[in-house]
Amino acid sequence: DLIGGQIIAAGQGPSTVTTDINIGMDAALADLEKRMGGLPDFDHRLASSSAAGGLAMITVGLVKELTAEAARQAALGAGAKLIGAHAYKLTVKDAEAITARQPDILLLAGGTDGGNEETILWNAQKLAEAQLACPVIVAGNRVVADDTADILSNAGIDVRISDNVMPEFNVLNVEPARAAIRNVFIERIVHAKGIDKAAKRFDAVLMPTPAAVMDGAKLLAEGSDTTPGLGNLIIVDV
């Protein structure tokens, strides 16, 4: 009840993410209908998806304390499950180990805008030679972003260019990379689970569940046009 600010009812169904999530969603709606004695006319239909545990993601940056940390924040903020983080120049074994872990997505950063160019180009070449099979978001030095993307795309890798996660020293700009991660989530993860079909039944574009939690936390902290926020807060997502 948006006017009263209350949760009226809840329904649930077993997960069917390994087959078709529409089956589980229909079961949850049937459970809700049983509890309420009928389904109401919904003003809004909104959804999020955990994608069977979230996006398995690896980040590669220039310096661990700087661009690698910025890449890590972008990954976690988008609802990704960070399974590895690398800094400095990748060795052949590093790149092969990344490929062997079969991440869903890789965020490649490195260098401020106009700063170090060599490392991100080097790392792109090593990843290309290791035959990385997942999409790569290039979010490093904008001066060589196109060249970096060309190295990867010439190896058959799906590449997206985003704004630099650290355009200036100690200045973070992670939101564009987060948006790119979410786009990959929608395009490559949820389509495999039948969520693209389910999306037609909702008003809003699907997003990763952890990203929805973060948006909710941001709303709580900052408030809306009509309601003030709570201010600084800590959210524990269990």
Enumerate the language-model features and the residues they cover:
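Nucleotide/phosphate-binding catalytic cleft detector across ATP-hydrolyzing
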Residues: 3-232
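Ser/Thr-glycine-rich phosphate-binding loops at phosphate-binding pockets of nucleotides
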Residues: 1, 238
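Short glycine-aspartate micro-motif
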Residues: 233-237
